[in-house]
């Protein structure tokens, strides 16, 4: 370990007696009051549209349950329903139909075998990866003849990302398919042939389906599916209508969040913090849910993220060590009476924080299910203590080892705080005291999701943070502990991220004491984190990089 020569927390200059604060200079909001104005223009879904939606829904349900007995057709139909984002309407039907083909193992079609494997694993069924042995040659390598089956190769590529640790054949499949699919793209770019399939390949190479946030993937796939010569017009129309109906509801929620943010006065009272209210809402739309019946959890989680962001920026970019000490005491004791000791900007933060949890508790108490709120408060208190630990490191100029860093930083990413806040809306039989206790103590997926979020965040932001004198990141701590280059450190951290995805996959195949909906929520958070931090970018902090996605999900309805 070594000491940094100059502590870079906010400090009081001895010569001027003025507080010097390492403000990060985040760019201003991109959306302002846009959704306050646009919400007034959102038309209420009329009765005729609702009736059309209901009729199409019944027709799609009939199609799912009466699809011809051909395995390929049935699997293709289920896959389309899921990728178009409307599977939440047909969960029982999909479960039943997959059950009917659970023992159908005779196919030698790479596309069918791979698709069946992926759909069953997505459903939580631990189908063996041995089904791919038939596609290897006598030397144990994938048969070269497979490269001519482009659709099959893409299907195998997507299936391989549902691997768990130790499934070497799936690791080999990713290498094999990636190499040859890139060749397909290269040829397509020169010949302009098979443009729709080439576009799917290009998209999948950028973000495999397993890592893709469902709502964004649905919006992308709606365009792809509409250009597929074999698309079903009824399913496509239903999916478009469903997307637009949900989008109208999401626009209103974005308006609610904007009004809450402005009414409390965040932009004026904490101007140093990131003003990302719409990006926060989108993050929760991807990480918590997009379904209409989970609006409370989506909005509550969005408010919690706003507080996490504001508090994180207070610790990183504004507060003095003395102020942070007082702030930590006030929050960990959860006592509004202690705010008199705080500077004005911190009084505002603490009051806003306590009010969010109090209001949620009062709302849930009306339904007799407020027991999740104490766990949510506890996670927030623990997060503040972790932030303060990192502040002490910086104040003392202390550089932790990688192992020491992980013991704090995996938790300080805030995922645990956020996940528990989102669980309060999962329902009486899921959001129970026992289940809260169990997931906090035993869930491998929780640590895996934290690992993905923290390491990808650090890889995306460590150079920016270095410029403003932030604590060392996972990249620097790994580099220092193991004596490797920056590039090698990043490579090793990405391997740890890949293994964490496998841990999530494994726990979803073996749900025991933790309910499946809680584990699925962690998968969604991992996906949303992948979207925010993929390719070494921080789309949340530098939100111009996600402006297009915000527009697709909130401002641009589909033509029907």
UniProtKB/Swiss-Prot annotation:
Disulfide bonds: none annotated. GO terms for molecular function: magnesium ion binding; terpene synthase activity. Keywords: Cytoplasm, Lyase, Magnesium, Manganese, Metal-binding. The keyword Manganese applies. Pfam families: Terpene_synth, Terpene_synth_C. Its main location: cytoplasm. Its EC number is 4.2.3.47. Pathway: Secondary metabolite biosynthesis; terpenoid biosynthesis. Mg(2+) 1 binds at residues 312, 316. CDD domains: Terpene_cyclase_plant_C1 (cd00684). Mg(2+) 2 binds at residues 312, 316. It comes from the Eukaryota. It is an enzyme of class 4 (lyase). GO terms for cellular component: cytoplasm. GO terms for biological process: diterpenoid biosynthetic process. Mg(2+) 3 binds at residues 457, 465. It is found in: Cytoplasm. A motif (DDXXD motif) lies at residues 312-316. Its cofactor is Mg(2+); Co(2+); Mn(2+). SUPFAM superfamilies: Terpenoid cyclases/Protein prenyltransferases (SSF48239), Terpenoid synthases (SSF48576). InterPro entries: Isoprenoid_synthase_dom_sf (IPR008949), Terpene_cyclase-like_1_C (IPR034741), Terpene_cyclase_plant_C1 (IPR044814), Terpene_synth_N (IPR001906), Terpene_synth_N_sf (IPR036965), Terpene_synthase-like (IPR050148), Terpene_synthase_metal-bd (IPR005630), Terpenoid_cyclase/PrenylTrfase (IPR008930). It catalyses: (2E,6E)-farnesyl diphosphate = (E)-beta-farnesene + diphosphate. Belongs to the terpene synthase family. Sesquiterpene cyclase catalyzing the production of beta-farnesene from farnesyl diphosphate. The Asp-Asp-Xaa-Xaa-Asp/Glu (DDXXD/E) motif is important for the catalytic activity, presumably through binding to Mg(2+). This is (E)-beta-farnesene synthase.
